């Protein structure tokens, strides 16, 4: 669509893309098998998305010479869903039919324990998610003020992953999505008297991230220098009795 003597242009597309027979890992095998599942063409994916482009171009005289300029903005988004995968039990360790690509499953937190007494009298069993705490010696082997309170979503009094399936995830739920959303770009250009200049900016509106084992190393585990990556303001972000509204829980060794 063009407006204002073709100076303003708007275009858009919406699409549905079906990807069939994707090469994916086979069904999870028992550990006693001693090998990974072979890859096979056994997955289908449906992607729904759109793209919108708005542009403006014009010119005017500057010191007797034409000054041309243009601005364009692009916005796009897409969501993908697994439509076929050999995982009838919907194990969370694999893809499953109906799964939105990039799902992040995890536990919800209800803040920190305010006092040692509250932690000691906590009725919800958190042993499965507090294995590192239980390994600590002495009083540090128990919940204390500043430790995390996990949310008991299924109300059974025990924090657990259930059967680790989409139908029985225990106290886990979808807490985010790692796929980028709302991709956008801005292009600026201008020309005058034989000179040209242009600039391009791009980004995404949203993307959730969950740290993996080496996620604190920006360049990955095999390119990192071996020194501390602790942020400069880390002490201000850790829970203490004087800082009960901290971002991080109680610091443990």
List PLM regions with ranges.
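Outer membrane beta-barrel strand-and-loop segments of large Gram-negative receptors
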Residues: 11-58, 108, 147-150, 157, ...
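Transmembrane beta-barrel architecture of outer-membrane proteins
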Residues: 7-9, 37, 47-51, 68, ...
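Transmembrane beta-strands of outer-membrane beta-barrel pores
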Residues: 14-20, 58, 75-81, 192-194, ...
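Transmembrane beta-strands of outer-membrane beta-barrel proteins
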Residues: 8-10, 69-71, 186, 192, ...
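Transmembrane beta-barrel domains of outer membrane proteins
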Residues: 1-2, 13, 53-57, 74, ...
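Outer-membrane beta-barrel proteins
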Residues: 19-25, 63-65, 79-86, 206-212, ...
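Conserved small-residue
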Residues: 40, 59-176, 218, 228-248, ...
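Flexible, surface-exposed loop regions and adjacent strand-edge segments
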Residues: 26-35, 86-96, 214-224
């Amino acid at each position: 669509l063009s407006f204002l003597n073709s100076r303003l242009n708007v275009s858009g597309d919406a699409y549905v893309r079906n990807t069939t027979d994707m090469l994916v890992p086979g069904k999870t095998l028992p550990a006693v098998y001693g090998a990974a599942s072979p890859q096979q063409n056994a997955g289908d994916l449906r992607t729904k998305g759109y793209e919108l482009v708005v542009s403006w171009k014009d010119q005017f005289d500057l010191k007797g010479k034409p000054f041309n300029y243009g601005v364009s903005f692009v916005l796009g988004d897409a969501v993908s869903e697994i439509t076929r995968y050999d995982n009838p039990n919907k194990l969370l360790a694999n893809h499953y039919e109906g799964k939105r690509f990039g799902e992040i499953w995890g536990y919800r937190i209800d803040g920190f324990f305010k006092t040692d007494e509250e932690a000691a009298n906590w009725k919800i069993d958190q042993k499965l998610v507090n294995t590192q705490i239980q390994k600590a010696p002495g009083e540090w082997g128990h919940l204390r003020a500043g430790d995390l309170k996990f949310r008991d979503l299924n109300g059974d009094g025990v924090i657990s992953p259930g059967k680790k399936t989409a139908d029985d995830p225990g106290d886990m739920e979808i807490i985010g999505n790692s796929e980028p959303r709302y991709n956008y770009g801005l292009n600026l250009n201008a020309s005058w008297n034989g000179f040209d200049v242009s600039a391009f900016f791009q980004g995404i509106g949203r993307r959730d991230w969950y740290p993996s084992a080496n996620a604190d190393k920006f360049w990955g585990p095999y390119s990192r220098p071996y020194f501390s990556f602790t942020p400069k303001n880390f002490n201000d972000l850790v829970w203490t009795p004087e800082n009960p509204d901290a971002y991080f829980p109680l610091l443990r060794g």
